[in-house]
């Protein structure tokens, strides 16, 4: 057989056998049009991009480093010129400051976005009315029975709480939180409401034991909010949240790690495996 390599103009198909590109073909313009139509962001490219960003942050991001300050909302490392200290001692990066959610109308819109996203991504719906209330930090933490003490490390301060009173459901959210943090908090609390509606709570307690019960609930809620951020294309914030949660020595961190074992994270903008929403009797 003839193994001789053909000339370039005969191998490069867009030249159509000519030595140069035919003048009638406007390839650069066609490429630009395809980009404007979003054709350069297919699922395979998105998966590669998400995986690359996740791997880069996994290698470079180290939470809780001595002498390093972190944004208490998105977890990014701070420099003095790019951050502010809030009245309660929390530190916030400028990006989180610019995207702070300040009105109840914004929160209600965010809740609708979260509800649509959970149905699209996880195939679940919240089938009961949920009252969304914006409160200050003092009232929120009074509801939780907690006191917040700020530190230099990423303080995983609770930004919301889901409350069930009989057949009434509500979510309290702290005002002034950044949009993405607020959205992730909403998904976390909406996951709890979904659990209240779909799980047999007594059966869950019997199956996993009282000592592991909180890990089952909180681990899934953390998995849900972080996976949601990945699916939204917010890979950097999702990965930082994943790393910070993995090292937590509480029901959130321990539960999250257990869920990761059964339900690995999908770094693309589509799910690549099962979710805990699919098994109501044995989620973990």
Task: Give, region by region, the residue ranges found by the protein language model.
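Sec-exported extracytoplasmic/periplasmic mature domains
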Residues: 119, 123, 195, 199, ...
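Auxiliary, metal-adjacent structural segments of Zn-dependent hydrolase domains
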Residues: 103-166
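Long, well-structured alpha-helical subdomains associated
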Residues: 231-284
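N-terminal low-structure segments adjacent to metalloprotease catalytic domains
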Residues: 1-18, 26-112, 116, 120
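Hydrophobic (often cysteine-bearing) scaffold residues that line and stabilize catalytic clefts
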Residues: 107-110, 183, 187, 213, ...
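Short pre-active-site segment immediately N-terminal to the catalytic Zn-binding motif
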Residues: 170-186
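Post-HExxH zinc-binding segment in Zn-dependent metallohydrolases
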Residues: 207-244
């Amino acid at each position: 057989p003839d193994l001789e390599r053909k000339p370039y103009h005969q191998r490069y198909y867009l030249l159509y056998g000519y030595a140069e590109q035919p003048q009638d073909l406007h390839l650069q313009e066609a490429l630009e049009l395809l980009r404007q139509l979003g054709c350069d962001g297919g699922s395979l490219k998105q998966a590669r991009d998400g995986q690359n960003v996740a791997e880069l942050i996994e290698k470079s991001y180290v939470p809780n480093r001595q002498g390093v300050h972190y944004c208490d909302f998105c977890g990014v490392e701070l420099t003095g010129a790019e951050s502010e200290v809030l009245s309660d001692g929390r530190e916030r990066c400028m990006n989180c400051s610019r995207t702070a959610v300040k009105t109840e109308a914004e929160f209600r819109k965010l809740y609708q976005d979260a509800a649509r996203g959970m149905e699209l991504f996880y195939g679940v719906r919240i089938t009961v009315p949920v009252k969304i209330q914006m409160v200050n930090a003092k009232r929120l933490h009074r509801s939780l029975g907690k006191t917040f003490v700020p530190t230099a490390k990423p303080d995983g301060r609770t930004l919301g709480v889901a409350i069930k009173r009989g057949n009434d459901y509500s979510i309290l959210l702290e005002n002034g939180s950044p949009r993405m943090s607020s959205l992730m908090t909403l998904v976390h609390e909406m996951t709890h409401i979904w659990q209240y509606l779909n799980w047999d709570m007594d059966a869950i307690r019997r199956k996993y034991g009282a000592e592991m019960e909180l890990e089952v609930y909180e681990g899934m809620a953390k998995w849900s909010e972080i996976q949601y951020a990945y699916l939204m294309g917010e890979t950097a914030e999702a990965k930082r949240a994943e790393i910070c949660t993995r090292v937590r020595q509480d029901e959130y961190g321990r539960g999250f790690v257990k869920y990761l074992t059964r339900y690995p994270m999908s770094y693309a903008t589509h799910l690549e495996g099962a979710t805990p929403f699919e098994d109501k009797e044995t989620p973990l």
